[in-house]
């Protein structure tokens, strides 16, 4: 799965129905990240008015266990499930490592999106796990 500062190649794939299980949207441009996330959400799950197939977390207080549990839960009524972790760079080192360890086991029907406020460090265990997921 790509971790991208430039969302255009990702968006082109979404139009064709090509999705990855994990995305890392990083960089200081909050507007571009949010617009990219909203486009992914619209393409991936479409209309989910009750929010039954969407979960959100804040990296400042999220645990890897809770994120992975949500990301591992199959969607209601078939379909797809979207999980977002905003400010993912705020996860502690221990939580980051646990999250990285669990990425490979996510169901194909689900998509985990990590929103990173700064440029992501490519040496990070989590960034490397996202790239290989």
Regions found by a protein language model. Give the residues of each.
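Conserved beta/loop motifs at nucleotide-recognition and modification sites
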Residues: 1-133
């Amino acid at each position: 799965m790509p971790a991208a500062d430039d969302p255009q190649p990702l968006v082109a794939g979404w139009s064709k129905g090509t999705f990855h299980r994990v995305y890392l949207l990083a960089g200081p441009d909050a507007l571009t990240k949010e617009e990219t996330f909203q486009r992914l959400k619209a393409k991936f799950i479409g209309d989910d008015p009750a929010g039954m197939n969407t979960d959100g977390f804040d990296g400042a207080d999220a645990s890897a266990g809770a994120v992975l549990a949500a990301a591992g839960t199959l969607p209601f009524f078939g379909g797809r499930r979207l999980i977002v972790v905003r400010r993912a760079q705020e996860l502690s080192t221990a939580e980051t490592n646990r999250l990285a360890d669990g990425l490979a086991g996510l169901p194909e029907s689900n998509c985990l999106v990590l929103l990173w406020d700064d440029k992501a460090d490519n040496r990070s265990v989590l960034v490397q796990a996202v790239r290989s997921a």
